[in-house]
Structures are given as C-alpha cells and as structure tokens.
Amino acid sequence: MITMNINGKMIECQEGQSVLEAARSAGIYIPTICYLSGCSPTVACKMCMVEMDGKRIYSCNTKAKNNATILTNTPTLMDERKSIMQTYDVNHPLECGVCDKSGECELQDMTHLTGVEHQPYAVADDFKALDSWAKALYDPNLCIMCERCVTTCKDNVGENNLKATKADLHAPDKFKDSMSKDAFSVWSRKQKGIISFVGSVPCYDCGECIAVCPVGALSYKDFAYTANAWELKKIHSTCSHCSAGCLISYDVRHFDTLGEESKIFRVLNDFYHNPICGAGRFAFDVSSSPKGSANLKEAQNALKECEAVRIGGDITNEEAFLIERLRKELDFKIYNQEAYRFQQFLKVLGEVKRPNIEEIKTSNLVVTIGSSIKTENPLVRYAINNALKLNKASLIAMHPIKDNVLANLCRSSFCITHEVGAEEILLGMLLKMLNIESAALKSLEDSKQSVVDEAALKALEEERKKALEQAEQGCSIGENKAENQEEDKTEATTPKENQEENKTEVKEEKIEVPTKTTYLLLEEAGINLETYEKILALLQKSNNTLLVVGEEIYSHKQAHNIAKMLRLLAQKSAVKLILIPPSANALGIASICELSEEIFEHEKIVGIRAKGDFTINSDNRVFGKDAVSKVDFILPSLNQLEGTITNIEGRVLPLKPALRFEGYDLSDIVQGFGFVEENLIECTHKLPTEAGFKAIEFDCLTNYFTNDRVNHRGYLLGTSHFENSAKECETIECEPIKPLKEKIAFNAYLKYPETQFNNATNKSENLQLKAGVYVSKAFLKKLNKEVGQNITLFKEEEELTGVLYLDESLDQEVFVISPSLLTNHSNFFREGVFDSVDLKEQA
C-alpha cells in the first residue's frame, strides 16, 4: 500500500492503481465522461485532469505515486473543464424534451456541474446519417465521441465491432487560439470522427454499448420514445438466466391509463462493475399471467400421488428448500439430471476455494476444459477477455469444437480441438506438467515414448556442417603456408598434418540423435508434441493460473475420477478453480436438495419449473399477448417473486419482483401439507446452515457495488457438507486415466446459442438469436439449405425438427442443437452432449 494526499486528505491505495481509481475508492469525486472502470483509459474527454505535485496530469492513465500531493478542483482546473463542456455542447441537438437519455444524461449533468451558461463557439453543422446494429440505434448527431462504446466492446465483450472512424466534418482551426489546449483537443476529436460498426460478422443481442453511452447517441430500438427516465421506477434484482447472477435493474412504469398494469420497459446494469449479456438485458418481456391459477387443491393432490418431482435448474433456493422438506414428508424422489451430476461431482471435489470473477481478470493464464464458455456463462467470457486485453494474460481453451469467438479475442488465445471424452487425459496432462504425483498418471507414464527431436537434430547437423567447413578452410590455409615457406618445410607441413587429422576426426564423429518424450495417450486425445510443449511453456511462465471447469465435465463417464484429480490439483498447486454450474441455481439446488438420478421409467412425475405429468410452472406470457406455454398450475416467473439464487461464486443473491402476480406460489401449495410459511422469503433465513447458508432474513440482503469495486451483493456461502463427503473419498486413490478406446465420431452438439438458456429466453420475442439448429457457413452451403428453413434430423427412428440458423463462429460440419428441441426421454444425446445423427431429406 502507498499513501497520497488528495485535497488535504491522506488516503491509502494499491501500488499500480490509477489516481482516478484511488480517489474513487476513497470517496473523492473526479469528473469523467469517457472512463470505464476495469477498461483501458482512452483520455478522450480530459475531464479527469488534476494537479499532482504542481503538474497537470490525467488521473485516468496516471499511476498513483507514494507521498504525492494531488489537487482536483483548483480554479484553473474548473475553468478547463468548463471550456471542455462548452465544446461538447457545440451544435448538440436541443431535443432534451424527447431524448431517451434526458434525466440521466451525463452531458446534462456535467454541463450543470461545470456551470456552462453561454456558448462562445459556433460552427456550421453537418449531415450525419443514422446507423443501427443488433438492438442499437446510433445517432451520430448526439454522439460526443467519448468512445466508451468502443472501449467496452473491446475490453469487456471482446468483439471489437466498433471503431472511431474519420469523418469529413467542419472542424476549423479558428478556435485554436481562443480555446484551451485540452478543450481544442476534445473539440477536434469530436469534429473529426464518428462511431462505425466494423465487425466482420453481425452483432446480436448484446447492448453493452447502449448501456455505457453517456448521452442519447446509442439507444435501445424498442425503448425509443416510449418513456422518460424520470417516470421509471428502478427495481434492483438479479438476472436468473445463467449462473453468473448479474446485477440488473428493471425500469418499470404503469402501462395503462389507470396505472394498474405495469410493464418492464428496459433492463439496465451497473456497467462500471458488471457488464451483462443480451439475455439479461433484453429477455425481460416474458412473465407469468398475473392472475395465476386457482386449482390449488389439484396441485396438492398431484404432489400427494406422485412418485417423483422434476425440478427446473432455475428454481429459487426457497422453492428448493420447500421441495426438499416436502420430499421428507411424502417420500418422493427429486429429479434434475444436470444438478444431480453436479452434486455428485461436488461430493468428491469438496470445498475448494471459489475465486470470484474479478480474480479471472488478474490471472496470467486461464485454462478452460469441458466448457463452451461463450454460451454457458457470458460473464466468465467477458472476464477472460478483460484479462487478455488488460493483464496481457494467455488463454488455453480445450474443447472438441473450436470456438472462433475465443480464438479471435487476441493473439494469446490458444484454442485446442481434442477428441470427445479426452478431458480426463487432458487433466492428467496438467497434473504431469505441474509435477503433481498421482496414481491417475500411471497409464499416462506407461504410454511414454521417445521420438526424434527434429529441430535439435537439424541444429546439430548445421553445427557439424559448419565445423567441417571450418576444418577444410583451416587445411587450405596450412597448404598455402607450405608453399610460401619453403625454407622451413617441417614447420610448414606440421600444421597441415594436424589439420588433416582434425578434419578426419570431424568426419568420423557420430552424431547422437536427440530425442523428445511424447505420450501416446495424449497423441490419441489430439494433443501432439508441438501443442504439448506450447501448453507446458505457458504453464511454466505463469505465476497466476486459473482453470475453468465447464458443465460437460459433470456428465463425463469418468467424472468421479476427474473430481478427485481436480481436488488434488487444488491442494497441491497454486492453480485456482472455477466451476461453472450447469444452470442458474444448480449450486443452490445441489446444496439444498437430496437429488436422485433420473432413470427413464414410467413414473408419475410432477414438474416444478420443469415438464411433468402435472406441470407447475410459469406459462411464459409475453407482455400484452396470450401465454405460450401450457401448464397445469401457474407459478410466478422469477421477475414476479421474492427469493434468492446462488451464483457461480457461491454468492446468495436476492430476486425482486418487477411485475405484479396475484396468484398462488409454491409456499401456498405446501401449506396444504402443514407448512407454516406464508410466503417464500419466510424460508430465506431457514436455508440449511450445514450447506453453508446463513440465517439472514431476505430484507437484510444488500445488492450493490461500491466505488472501490467491492461486491456488497448478498452473502457468500460458508463451508458446506460437500467437504465432509470429499474427505471420506480422499482415502481412495485416483484411478489410472482410462485411454480412449476409440474415437467418437460426431456431427451433433447439444448446446444453446448465445443468449439462450431456458424456457424464458426461448419464449422471448426481444432476442434476435432463437433456439434451433445452428450450422457453419460452409456446412449450410453443403447442405444446400437456407437460414430460416426447417430441418429434420433423426436417430433410431426418432425425429427432431428445428429452424436452421447460421453460426458465424463455427467452422466444423456439426449441427448445434438447442436442448429445448428435445423431449424428456429422447434417444438423442443419451451418452452426452455429442452425438451422431442423420439428416432427413425433405420430399
């Protein structure tokens, strides 16, 4: 830690921290327009200027210095900032009355803050054409060229789709003498450029550029001219689509003239701390019919008569708690196959330290295994990109399908395409590289073999050739001496003889062929020697490595052994582990419920937020339209209730209702069995402490970040019962890694596209990416089909039909199939997420 004096206040800050971040952490305000926390500074607005030890600096890109004296608000600095705001206001359209940003516009705020009362500058205005991409509308007439959108697209999202490009606008130099240097710099930047979409592929469902725009230049298409910022009520909640559990804010306002019907107009995020994906931002249009269901007795009877309850991966902790208590009362089984596998995995792995998302950003090396990061957890992908861009980290992404999104993040992205089922072998490779001894490595060691080191052999041959040439050159010199020094033949011939001897020795010297060690097991898995050496070099170079384990690991045939190997890795090395839960609240469900493996038998099953013979779920009503899902009993959607979910970091986070729901919820159903809780949140402080939950009431849960980037959202789980079960497993050694018996041929992969996660996102009309069958551009051409056509695939006489879409990031000839297209007992993907299917030709 170092100390600085800011405006007479002594503060402590981290070495290497910027002056701006240090000031913000200490609660000292320095104005900015272009700066985004956790991103590279652009110094576009110059508003963050301060004086450090008597010299003017820009606080966003200047590192804190020990014992420095800093002033942030001298009269000179305030005059400079006022001049800058005057240049920003030149020709800015006076449409605040109808601008979507009015009331929360940073240009308005800064104009008032700096006291701009008149405009001394004038210049001819220019025509600037409107533009749009994805869900964004771009009005360059409102743009102040702060380049926040460019920065977040590059440093957070990782797409590099936006760029500041040159524009032929009026930018006379006549103000150079009358404007201050910084103000003229800002003026020139604004008058000589616009933002352009430069991506090589289309952008879908993101909107982070809209979120960070400080003015009305970038707006959400469906929000334009529908509501004013000051009319909207902000409800802070948690996104429930994936396990990231991002902080979101619903902007809600009455929709009818009587004020009885409310509507979510948009979703915002705290972009300084938590970028969000398109699902969190746009899939807010789906909820349950507000009246709910009246057939309470029918739902209770269905639970009495059922043999099992199948639960969805997004049920709340409180719903899981009630279902588990009901299981003990009625003796039924609880099914959720994904959460069950995750639970079994955790019982062996135990309680390894859970890094938070911020720790990904500070890593030197990130390794991913068994995960399609871009679809499973977008926030993890954003953090990886941030580490690559700002921390100069490297990425090793190992998966049977190459992800060009990850590969194109930067030059230090290394994507490895391996054989299906090789994850256990790859983890053994990592243990070997980290010098961790384990019985698991026996089969790997047994497959060791030596091969010729071609590079070293070539170098030796070059060296030998060079030595021969030098010897021959020396011999020639000796002969010349003999001819020129006839008076002393003995002395002249002696060197020649020696040289001949040396020459003979060089010729007869045998080269020992250099070898390298390879492993047949790795070769069979798709890891050749060159790849092995590159991974080894990156691991040895890194002093802060993080391993991301994806959901495909939990369904691996060797998941039990992989869990033991990962526990060993966590105990014996400094490598950090992040496990991506397979659904939004899989960690909460696995911690609370006693799950059973679902065997495909004829049972009476009640589905709670899942399909069943009797289905208790949201009916997925798009606002203003009829419900699209047929259910037997309507539950409130997760944007209509109070409760909690547990995210990837093990953080218990609050859900808040944005829309009204007048019907019954699960707490009303279970009251018929003698339960006393009148609503779900009466269970929040009763969640099992042996699973790591704390006796904290729902209304005491906080949900915000502070300026020093500290997370004050909910609370972190404590040590859970998983650790006790893992310690029991420790007495059993790891099994030797199993070789791949044969390569698994596949042409189908079970995975949602980006921004699709569950029924709610599937039914959303706001999202551009839909559930369906996705293929690469080359494969689409080979199939001789067009986007939007229906395609039918079959396996063992069962057919699957979906709409055909293009995945621009895909190269391989594979059908990427959305899970929502499958039935519960489908023949497709019975052995895992990779399968071989046939195409049904249309008549």
Predicted regions and their residues:
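A cross-kingdom feature strongest in bacterial/archaeal respiratory oxidoreductases
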Residues: 1, 30, 35-39, 324, ...
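N-terminal export/assembly segments and adjacent metallocofactor-ligating motifs
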Residues: 1-24, 32, 36, 40, ...
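N-terminal single-stranded DNA-binding subdomain of primase/primase-helicase replication proteins
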Residues: 45-63
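A generic structural signal for residues embedded in beta-strands
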Residues: 50-53, 547, 793
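N-terminal leader/propeptide and maturation segments of large enzyme subunits in energy/redox metabolism
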Residues: 92-123, 129, 149, 159-169, ...
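Short acidic, S/G/P-rich loop/turn micro-motifs used as interaction or catalytic elements
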Residues: 315-317, 371-377, 552-558, 612, ...
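Structural alpha-beta junctions
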Residues: 327-335, 388-394, 411-413, 438, ...
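Active-site phosphate/pyrophosphate-binding segments
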Residues: 411-609, 690-719
